[in-house]
Amino acid sequence: MERRQDRIRNFCIIAHIDHGKSTLADRIIELTGALTEREMQDQVLDTMDIERERGITIKAQAVRLNYKAKDGKEYTFHLIDTPGHVDFTYEVSRSLAACEGAILVVDATQGIEAQTLANVYLALEHNLEIIPVINKIDLPSARPEEVKKEIEDVIGLDASDAPLISAKMGINIEEVLERIVRDIPPPKGDDTKPLKALIFDSLYDNYKGVLAYVRVFDGVVKPNMTIKMMSTGAQFTVTEVGYFKPGMLIPCEELRAGDVGYIAASIKTVRDTRVGDTITDANNPADEPLPGFRRLNPMVFCGIYPTGDTKYEELKEALEKLQLNDAALFFEPESSAALGFGFRCGFLGLLHMEIVQERLEREYDLNIITTAPSVVFKVTKTDGEVLYIDNPTKLPPPNEIAKMEEPMVKATIMVPNEFVGSVMELCQERRGIFKDMSYIETTRVILTYEMPLMEIVYDFFDALKSRSKGYASFDYEFIGYAESKLVKLDIMIKGEVVDALSFIVHKDKAYQRARRIVEKLKEEIPRHLFEIPIQACIGSKVIARETVKALRKDVLAKCYGGDVTRKKKLLEKQKEGKKRMKQVGEVEIPQEAFMAVLKLED
């Protein structure tokens, strides 16, 4: 006897950026007739403008498609679109947990890249059935046979009968659909057991509140049930359940084991629906949650301050709105003597930070200034207390610190072998510890390094791309904390510390960094009528100094020839005045000066 679930296939598509993931999704949606040709547009599943422009997927999306296979049966596909970028690894792993299989898209001209590898390993950890697919075979530079061999050597998947497709031209897409039916196992699950559903994403809807995107593993969920979140114990009453068609929500009577869809339960904030959490029936709860849930901790912090005509309240409102859809974004109010009131924000990584900044500027039309990104340091004080510090101004004085540790990451870099030397040199400069090196075929190398996150946060990615002419790809994962010689560098302008410019830096690099900053500030701060010393110091020791010279009026202009004592008197008087000004004068530091220092490239 055939079970209802035997005709369901849950799968996702994994690929490196630009290998054609969203295009393949578009073709699959078109072939299964989910959208008419009139409604089709490129990258159907990427709903944010930024996603389309950068060609990346940030939020996971899910659609239900019906497909009539060659065996005459009608199948239900749930395609879950996952983000491919390293910052969103946890979201990817949750999306993968909602599937039974994955389509691995590899570009026939590029071969395997670092992020493909990272996501494939995630898929293997979840025991997914992986179907390799080779895309872009319509391009003259395609080399499908070599790429097949690469997939077999590097990942160990049998790619001998991998479908060769062109998502753009729509070649061989049907073969992929047939492989999905044939190779991906149907969901296992039991309608009669207590409800267990995995949240793999959530979205804030202005009318329905938060929609939790779920994959039901056991049981049934329908409206008017009381559900409970297993990590927080919060309870809600379901108001609507349904599934996704591209760009639409279709309400239905119930979601059963094996289904993918959404649950609306007038939930107020995304915080209550944490990605990876398990939803269960409050009256008949499951014994234990689905595995793999963890709280997301921000890794990178920076200050965001309003400038120009943007008000603090507007910035606060915008951040709150962004947070409705982005549970990983963290922010708290902070004030700085130099920049006024603003927020300290925490992000998953650099891309996440850039996207949030860009959305604030574009979607909410705000003018903001951001301080240099920093990471979370672990500080053990002499009395044994352990602090986690995300803001250099909160660092205790040096005599109270027993040791400081910084976050380390394991970086995997794939690079063509002619650039190995310069990439290794870059990693050495960034205090990387060499771990491993292996060759793919004869042309490409995988390098593994352990590196301080602080060194990557700054502009590692750009430096890597420029040293390898854009060919290197890069992926990192957090591995823990390691002790390090770190110092806090303060910048003093006319004897006063400017809090917005303080940062924590490695001892060996402190001097170079300090030198560059004071030189930059000297260019940026306009001359006043008195001289302004700019000093960089560690504790009370000044390690670099520049002076902005004073402007002076020519007081002797009116003395022709005249008596030398008269000239002396005027000069003395000017000197007195300058001295007095130096004591009471205020230094105006323009906004551009801050921007210039925060943007200092290595």
From Swiss-Prot:
Top-tier EC class: hydrolase
Q: Name one Pfam family in it.
A: EFG_C
Give the GO molecular function terms. Answer: GTP binding; GTPase activity; ribosome binding; translation elongation factor activity
One Gene Ontology term, aspect cellular component:
plasma membrane
Enzyme Commission code:
3.6.5.n1
According to its UniProt record, which reaction does this protein catalyse?
GTP + H2O = GDP + phosphate + H(+)
Membrane topology label: Peripheral membrane protein
Q: Could you tell me which InterPro entries the record lists for this protein?
A: EF-4, EFG_III/V, EFG_V-like, EFTu-like_2, G_TR_CS, LepA_C_sf, LepA_CTD, LepA_IV
Q: Which residues cross the membrane?
A: none
Please give the Gene3D superfamilies that the UniProt record associates with this protein: 3.30.70.240, Elongation factor 4, C-terminal domain (3.30.70.2570), Elongation Factor G (Translational Gtpase), domain 3 (3.30.70.870), P-loop containing nucleotide triphosphate hydrolases (3.40.50.300), Translation factors (2.40.30.10)
- Specify the tr-type G domain's residue ranges: 6-188
UniProt keyword Hydrolase present: yes
Give the record's GO biological process terms.
positive regulation of translation
From the Swiss-Prot or TrEMBL record, state where the protein is found. Answer: Cell membrane
Binding residues for GTP: 18-23, 135-138
Per UniProt, the keywords (alphabetical) are: Cell membrane, GTP-binding, Hydrolase, Membrane, Nucleotide-binding, Protein biosynthesis
The record's comment on protein family reads: Belongs to the TRAFAC class translation factor GTPase superfamily. Classic translation factor GTPase family. LepA subfamily.
What is this protein's function per UniProt?
A: Required for accurate and efficient protein synthesis under certain stress conditions. May act as a fidelity factor of the translation reaction, by catalyzing a one-codon backward translocation of tRNAs on improperly translocated ribosomes. Back-translocation proceeds from a post-translocation (POST) complex to a pre-translocation (PRE) complex, thus giving elongation factor G a second chance to translocate the tRNAs correctly. Binds to ribosomes in a GTP-dependent manner.
Which protein are we looking at?
Elongation factor 4
Q: Which organism is it from?
A: Caldicellulosiruptor bescii (strain ATCC BAA-1888 / DSM 6725 / KCTC 15123 / Z-1320)
The uppermost taxa in this organism's lineage are:
Bacteria, Bacillati, Bacillota, Bacillota incertae sedis, Caldicellulosiruptorales
